[in-house]
Amino acid sequence: MSKEIKFSSDARSAMVRGVDILADTVKVTLGPKGRNVVLEKSFGSPLITNDGVTIAKEIELEDHFENMGAKLVSEVASKTNDIAGDGTTTATVLTQAIVREGIKNVTAGANPIGIRRGIETAVAAAVEALKNNAIPVANKEAIAQVAAVSSRSEKVGEYISEAMEKVGKDGVITIEESRGMETELEVVEGMQFDRGYLSQYMVTDSEKMVADLENPYILITDKKISNIQEILPLLESILQSNRPLLIIADDVDGEALPTLVLNKIRGTFNVVAVKAPGFGDRRKAMLEDIAILTGGTVITEDLGLELKDATIEALGQAARVTVDKDSTVIVEGAGNPEAISHRVAVIKSQIETTTSEFDREKLQERLAKLSGGVAVIKVGAATETELKEMKLRIEDALNATRAAVEEGIVAGGGTALANVIPAVATLELTGDEATGRNIVLRALEEPVRQIAHNAGFEGSIVIDRLKNAELGIGFNAATGEWVNMIDQGIIDPVKVSRSALQNAASVASLILTTEAVVANKPEPVAPAPAMDPSMMGGMM
């Protein structure tokens, strides 16, 4: 395929047009009075959303050069979403502001490399000032405020706050679709995995079809149990203790399963067998997690252990285990707290180093199960369109809340970025680096301007007053009042503001230093084939 190439100002101008098209589409959603954007879907009903990254990902421009500019801004939104989970619209607005001011100076003859160094220095100073202004999120009320601001719903804020209180900041909080119209919170305490009993005859409650085991022993193995003789010595020891048994194995089949079921029905002992969770290496890791949580040992050939040699000391223990046809929940495992803490630290380290989004998600789930439980927010709505929009808002709120717990909060509504302007202005830079600093100074005002504009106010007047206001005092665009943003619960996580600024500056600098752009040349559309006269038949 042949290529089309543009150089210097022609290349940058085309990319900037793409940046502006995408940013102008996204920035209308910013703030408490931001509007929605309707996205056409290839099938199903249109998606109505105010989620910046969702909108950015949908935009494809016909002009290849403009599309490259749009895609670079979309990358800013995506990266900010990956790191902080929110702030994608702010990142887009900042990118457009830096590019717009930067292009003016580059076109006027400034050196783009010098400008880039100035931008990097200014952003580093702004980030440091943001961190210095941070307030730790230490209580349930503060968490609820962060979530409420992001989701634009106090009720959602309460759900997320309650969920984090129940499962901890490392716990898994999932968002599912409810069958009804109401949004509700469901918390599963302890370690849960998606494997149910191997036989319905193992239930202890025939009405609910669940098996409840109080103070059970837990046999954990990656082997398949087909011969009852392999575990007979162990069963005899458990029988003497008069305690129930949970078997977690690769499988239980052959004569072993009917023998266990028969003894359960006769009342000889209370036993439930389930398959081990996961597959391959992930299964081994999850079995090890269960063993550490319950204080047991995984009976595996990798450690040179055989089922026939296993003793009661190798079994795990828990206060309670509940098993239904689809899942198993282990509550209050008897594992060593230090061993559990060490395992948690190892998994956290793996989360930080992995490059796979799928692996990171699975590691987060394992971390949550070791840390205390899983909370499920079941989203209800009247229509499918409303449901999709609600789910996106709650996901943003959840991500923002986690970011707030991690690095603290600052005043919201763009106020925090405006508050760091003095720290950037004091940087002593010269030449093109000073120009780069001034570009960042102008960009830091842009989120406040856009929020005010979307709410029907004049952004320049708001920013002028904000520059002279005390730290934390800002403009509440929802009411048109000047308030203490923190006291009013108008807050942003530091991680969100920081990531938005850093990612915007990074990509904007790349655009400013671009000197040539190479794009695929559109293929000419082939003319339609001429109709064969013989096909005309009686039409002649």
Curated annotation (Swiss-Prot):
It comes from the Bacteria. One of its GO terms (cellular component) is GroEL-GroES complex. Its main location: cytoplasm. Its EC number is 5.6.1.7. It is found in: Cytoplasm. It is an enzyme of class 5 (isomerase). The keyword Cytoplasm applies. SUPFAM superfamilies: GroEL apical domain-like, GroEL equatorial domain-like, GroEL-intermediate domain like. Keywords: ATP-binding, Chaperone, Cytoplasm, Isomerase, Nucleotide-binding. GO terms for biological process: chaperone cofactor-dependent protein refolding; protein refolding; response to heat. It catalyses: ATP + H2O + a folded polypeptide = ADP + phosphate + an unfolded polypeptide. ATP binds at T29, L30, G31, P32, D86, G87, T88, T89, T90, G413, N476, A477, A478, D492. GO terms for molecular function: ATP binding; ATP-dependent protein folding chaperone; isomerase activity; unfolded protein binding. It holds the Pfam family Cpn60_TCP1. Together with its co-chaperonin GroES, plays an essential role in assisting protein folding. The GroEL-GroES system forms a nano-cage that allows encapsulation of the non-native substrate proteins and provides a physical environment optimized to promote and accelerate protein folding. Forms a cylinder of 14 subunits composed of two heptameric rings stacked back-to-back. Interacts with the co-chaperonin GroES. Belongs to the chaperonin (HSP60) family. This is Chaperonin GroEL. It comes from Streptococcus pneumoniae (strain ATCC BAA-255 / R6). The gene is groEL.
